[in-house]
Amino acid sequence: PVWSWHVGTAVRPREDRGLVSDDLYIAAKRVVSLLADAGHESYFAGGCVRDRILGLLPEEYDIATAAHPPQVRAIFPRARRVGEAFGVMLVRQDEYMFDVATFRTDGSYADHRRPNSVTFSDAQHDAARRDFTINGLFEDPIKGEVIDLVNGRADLEAGVVRAIGDPRKRLDEDHLRMLRAVRFAARFNFAIEDETAAAMQ
């Protein structure tokens, strides 16, 4: 498939949800800013972007970046390894902890749960490896823009859970993705897209 790049204004969450303080957002934005100031393309990624567009206040923020683990540690010397082989570092900012993950592509999934290997890549390939289009969005909190490489925003607006790429391949990589599809559909009152639903049978 051809992944299109759409940029739009991010939607700030409604403040009446009360899940967490907005201090979490400020701390997460600070992590992105420090990475960007060091010259590394960096974004909010995945579920936090989805929730913000839906008007929900995220309980956590994941950050995706072009920085490799040693570069992350150079900026955050106390960063901890939580999956360095997969490009994931745990960074503390203020009193909050954030997963900071290097953009990557995944190798084969021999155990139907985790990739055997990863290759560090770019934002486009990182979005393409994710499970569902609604979780494949990035947000640049500095510019206040949503970066949509997988047409996820249209599926959010339509209320659709759709696998990225080939649904059978995507679900076979990690069998728990089928449960996640059902959970997202129930949580947001979304429909599971036909080809994705067929791949779950």
Regions found by a protein language model. Give the residues of each.
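Catalytic cores of the polymerase beta-like nucleotidyltransferase superfamily
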Residues: 1-201
